[in-house]
Amino acid sequence: MPDIKLLSEGIFEIMKDKRQLATLNLDPGKVVYGEKLISVEGAEYRTWDPRRSKLGAMVLKKFNIPLSKDSKVLYLGAASGTTVSHVSDIASEGAVYSVEFASRSMRDFIRLASRRKNIFPILADAGKPDSYAHIVEPVDLIFQDVAQPNQAEIAARNAARFLNKNGYLLLSIKARSIDTAASPKEIFKEEVKKLEQAFEPGFEILTARDLMPYHEDHLGVLAKLKE
């Protein structure tokens, strides 16, 4: 029988031939992106590939992941739902408001959302939060993974509009979407500075780590609103 270890609420490590990250499957018997299903003592787990998920990489890079079963989450950059599906597993009794701009990705994503009662797909530009303000309630966590040059600004706009006072921001900063020539370290430094000074009261940076070896030229950031 595989060994299973709880890493944080709703996130597990399973040892079966090799160490694998996993979440408890909210949609038993179904896979989302070709991941493996592993049954342990009557419960079904979905393996979570950190090379296909910035959030999965953050787990393995020892970030604190402020998610619980009743979390309300705003996910910016949902794509076709690979990582959103794992957030849905974790926040099984919460809500995952999922914003994606590409209509092709959204078509695939809607099929996933139709099987999971806690996912709310939103076809919109994450840089224009007022366009979906009538749908999204105040949230406990904003997770952002967008490939736009103004990533810090997008995070700040959405936090100002939706993030609870005691909420958190998890952000994957993709250096090459901001500047293809500059040093990633310099880009990361500037983006973190923008977050700290983005708006009143600004963000307090709790953790900032590169996501190697899972994602090249990416920085993971955990932040909360300053007191």
From Swiss-Prot:
Keywords annotated in UniProt: Methyltransferase, RNA-binding, rRNA processing, Transferase, tRNA processing
Amino-acid positions noted as binding S-adenosyl-L-methionine in the UniProt annotation, renumbered to this chain: 82-83, 100-101, 125-126, 145-148
InterPro entries linked to this entry: Fibrillarin, Fibrillarin_CS, SAM-dependent_MTases_sf
GO terms under biological process: box C/D sno(s)RNA 3'-end processing; rRNA methylation; tRNA processing
Signal peptide segment: none
Any one GO molecular-function label of the UniProt entry: histone H2AQ104 methyltransferase activity
EC numbers for this chain: 2.1.1.-
SS bond partners: none
Any Pfam family matching the protein: Fibrillarin
PANTHER family, per the entry: FIBRILLARIN (PTHR10335:SF17), RRNA 2-O-METHYLTRANSFERASE FIBRILLARIN (PTHR10335)
Function summary: Involved in pre-rRNA and tRNA processing. Utilizes the methyl donor S-adenosyl-L-methionine to catalyze the site-specific 2'-hydroxyl methylation of ribose moieties in rRNA and tRNA. Site specificity is provided by a guide RNA that base pairs with the substrate. Methylation occurs at a characteristic distance from the sequence involved in base pairing with the guide RNA.
Subunit structure: Interacts with nop5. Component of box C/D small ribonucleoprotein (sRNP) particles that contain rpl7ae, FlpA and nop5, plus a guide RNA.
Family of this protein: Belongs to the methyltransferase superfamily. Fibrillarin family.
Identification of the protein by name: Fibrillarin-like rRNA/tRNA 2'-O-methyltransferase
